[in-house]
Swiss-Prot record:
The record marks 21, 28, 266, 362 as: Transition state stabilizer. This is Bifunctional enzyme IspD/IspF. It catalyses: 2-C-methyl-D-erythritol 4-phosphate + CTP + H(+) = 4-CDP-2-C-methyl-D-erythritol + diphosphate; 4-CDP-2-C-methyl-D-erythritol 2-phosphate = 2-C-methyl-D-erythritol 2,4-cyclic diphosphate + CMP. HAMAP family: IspD (MF_00108), IspDF (MF_01520), IspF (MF_00107). Keywords: Isoprene biosynthesis, Lyase, Metal-binding, Multifunctional enzyme, Nucleotidyltransferase, Transferase. It comes from Leifsonia xyli subsp. xyli (strain CTCB07). InterPro entries: IspD (IPR001228), IspD/F (IPR026596), IspD/TarI (IPR034683), IspD/TarI_cytidylyltransf_bact (IPR050088), ISPD_synthase_CS (IPR018294), MECDP_synthase (IPR003526), MECDP_synthase_CS (IPR020555), MECDP_synthase_sf (IPR036571). Its EC number is 2.7.7.60, 4.6.1.12. The record marks 160, 213 as: Positions MEP for the nucleophilic attack. The lineage of its organism: Bacteria, Bacillati, Actinomycetota, Actinomycetes, Micrococcales. GO terms for biological process: isopentenyl diphosphate biosynthetic process, methylerythritol 4-phosphate pathway; terpenoid biosynthetic process. The keyword Lyase applies. Bifunctional enzyme that catalyzes the formation of 4-diphosphocytidyl-2-C-methyl-D-erythritol from CTP and 2-C-methyl-D-erythritol 4-phosphate (MEP) (IspD), and catalyzes the conversion of 4-diphosphocytidyl-2-C-methyl-D-erythritol 2-phosphate (CDP-ME2P) to 2-C-methyl-D-erythritol 2,4-cyclodiphosphate (ME-CPP) with a corresponding release of cytidine 5-monophosphate (CMP) (IspF).
């Protein structure tokens, strides 16, 4: 969620289109898909971006209040809303006029690309940062493309190896996009064309098949079918075991336990957090904690369990799920967990935005935990469609 008062990134979400080809009788961004409008679904991805962003929604003038309410519902916080222009280009120009001081990178996104994952937004930002120029996501063209005359006669077969079907969000350094719009003398089909016409380089990076534009009734049915595949609840299981390390501090269930021996590990050794992460990743079919947060990544050396849980929640939500509930059971002789159970459950529930229950037991002296050599945790997680 965007919480920074002066974010360096802004996302302009264009939601002013009439939706004539969709035939829904209302502007396209306000059409419902699986119980939520296209605008809400588009903003959900923005909410899951790694870095906070200012959000500017460009909507029809007569629906600004509705756009503000839907924007807050989808983004989870208030968004800036401005009236659109006569054309898409005019609408984006209106959005540019609402950018706050301090914004350095601008992403322009079509609300009609409602299933675009947050990872695509993050990839565009990273590419703009790396290259200092415009970036658009695109997919290879798989169909054979013919150039035809007005009479329908084929004039040429275009080499599809040099073609890319571009998507949004399209990202640019703010100064370049503002300059391109100021210099525009004709309406172009997208922002990348405007930037290129103004002499600014634009690079294509790999896009995502889910970022297709919902323009026709067939597109809407396709999106509904994709969402239907996410509708069934997902259950994941995770486990983790760490040996005691008397030289380390003990972190367990997000809490520091003074006077107790710590657990060995690349991070803080919080086995409760790690088992929950594995359960969530398993339910979302995202792999496991080792594959996602490998021990070779210095960003997570010594990191607390809350860091892993926060990022895992973001990844799960990026895939289109919400966390239903989580249950974890600690197996070990120490520490005595019952006195701090409520404290741990409150912290974990806050981090994950869902109910978390934690219980504890022993193995009556059997095995590694029974001998007092370490702690094991088993966790289950339930994921639901948003």
């Amino acid at each position: 969620m965007c919480t920074a008062s002066r974010p360096r990134i802004a996302v302009i979400v264009v939601a002013a289109g009439s939706g004539t080809r969709l035939g829904a009788g209302s502007p396209k961004a306000f059409v419902t898909l699986g119980g939520r409008t296209l605008l809400e679904r588009s903003l959900h991805a923005v909410r899951c971006m790694r870095e906070p962003a200012q959000v500017v929604v460009v909507a029809p003038e007569e629906r600004l209040a509705e756009a503000a309410a839907l924007g807050e519902a989808g983004f989870g916080a208030a968004v800036d809303v401005v009236a659109g222009g006569e054309t898409r280009q005019g609408s984006v120009a209106a959005g540019l006029g609402a950018l706050r001081e301090g914004v350095e990178i601008v992403l322009v996104h079509d609300a009609a690309r409602a299933l675009t994952p947050a990872a695509q937004f993050d990839a565009v930002v990273a590419a703009v940062d790396a290259g200092g120029a415009g970036v658009v996501p695109g997919l290879p063209v798989s169909d054979t493309i013919k150039r035809v005359g007005a009479d329908g006669e084929v004039r040429e077969t275009v080499d599809r190896s040099v073609l890319s079907a571009v998507q949004t969000p399209q990202g640019f350094p703010r100064d370049q996009l503002v300059a391109a719009y100021a210099a525009a003398t004709t309406d172009e089909t997208d922002d990348a064309e405007l930037a290129a016409a103004a002499g600014h380089p634009v690079t294509v990076i790999p896009g995502d098949a889910r970022a297709f534009k919902i323009t026709t009734p067939w597109d809407l049915r396709r999106a509904e079918e994709l969402l239907a595949g996410l509708a069934a609840p997902r259950i994941g299981f995770g486990t983790d075991t760490h040996a005691f390390d008397p030289s380390a501090e003990l972190w367990l269930a997000g809490l520091r336990w003074e006077g107790e021996p710590g657990l060995a590990g690349h991070s803080d050794g919080d086995v409760v957090a790690h088992a929950i992460v594995d359960a969530l990743l398993s339910a979302a079919r995202l792999g496991d904690i080792g594959g996602v947060f490998g021990t070779g990544d210095p960003r997570f050396s010594g990191a607390h369990g809350e860091v892993f849980l926060t990022e895992t929640r973001r990844l799960v939500e990026e895939e289109g799920f919400r966390i239903g509930n989580v249950s974890a059971q600690i197996v070990g002789n120490r520490p005595k967990f019952a006195p701090r159970r409520a404290e741990a459950e409150t912290l974990l529930s806050r981090v994950l935005g869902a109910p978390v229950s934690v219980s504890a037991t022993t193995t009556d002296g059997l095995g590694l935990t029974g001998r007092g050599e370490g702690v094991a945790v088993f966790a289950t997680a339930l994921l639901l469609a948003p």
